């Protein structure tokens, strides 16, 4: 499938190419160029929903829970890769193994991307913050409706409201803060583009990144009080 848009890329140097990783069971740890060990933002935010996930597993059964989680992880990874290739102006964005339901999810969000995404600054880039003591990999930082934004592509089995995705907004706020720390370039907007199973109409959430920093700080503080990873 050939891209019908050409996206302009204006890369920004972070001062490093990649981050290292340390092996700690159950926790993703990044190692910064200075040798500091930071937990991933997904690990930190995952700690606040862990209890709810365990309750859900108990309710639906381990086998069904494993099936649903595997399906969600597979389709999410596949959609991210397609979006990354598309924004990189690659002609072939589907692999021979791309499933029909993933193509359907992509077709639902493609018009949103075409109509609103402008210059691309970063894609699938590692970021870390010495202020927060956390690291992670951002999906995309690009202009959205003319405003530099952290853009994340999500999938869901059903339509959601923003009350159910506060962790997404905190994640985006972290990426914005870490990017500013590394580049001194502010990113004030987060955009969550959510593709929904069997629904041609995606959901787009937009938030001010600064709005979620207070909640993010509290979650990190709680996580650091409960876990030791250094």
Give the ranges of each region predicted by the language model.
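Mg2+/Mn2+-dependent nuclease catalytic core
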Residues: 124-229
């Amino acid at each position: 499938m050939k891209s019908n848009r050409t996206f302009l890329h204006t890369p920004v140097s972070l001062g490093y190419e990649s981050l290292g990783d340390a092996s700690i069971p159950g926790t993703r740890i990044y190692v910064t160029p200075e040798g500091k060990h930071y937990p991933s933002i997904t690990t930190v935010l995952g700690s606040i929903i862990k209890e709810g996930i365990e309750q859900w597993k108990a309710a639906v059964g381990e086998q069904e829970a494993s099936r649903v989680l595997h399906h969600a992880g597979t389709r999410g990874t596949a959609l991210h890769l397609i979006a990354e290739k598309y924004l990189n102006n690659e002609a072939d964005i589907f692999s021979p193994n791309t499933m029909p339901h993933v193509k359907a999810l992509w077709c639902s969000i493609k018009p949103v991307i075409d109509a609103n995404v402008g210059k691309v600054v970063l894609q699938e880039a590692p970021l870390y913050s010495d202020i927060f003591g956390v690291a992670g990999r951002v999906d995309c930082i690009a202009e959205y409706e003319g405003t530099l934004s952290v853009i994340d592509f999500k999938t869901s089995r059903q339509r959601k409201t923003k009350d159910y995705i506060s962790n997404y907004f905190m994640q985006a706020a972290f990426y914005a803060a870490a990017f500013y720390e590394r580049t001194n370039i502010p990113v004030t907007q987060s955009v969550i583009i959510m593709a929904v199973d069997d629904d041609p109409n995606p959901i787009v959430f937009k938030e001010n990144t600064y709005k979620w920093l207070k909640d993010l700080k509290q979650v990190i503080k709680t996580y650091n009080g409960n876990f030791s990873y250094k």
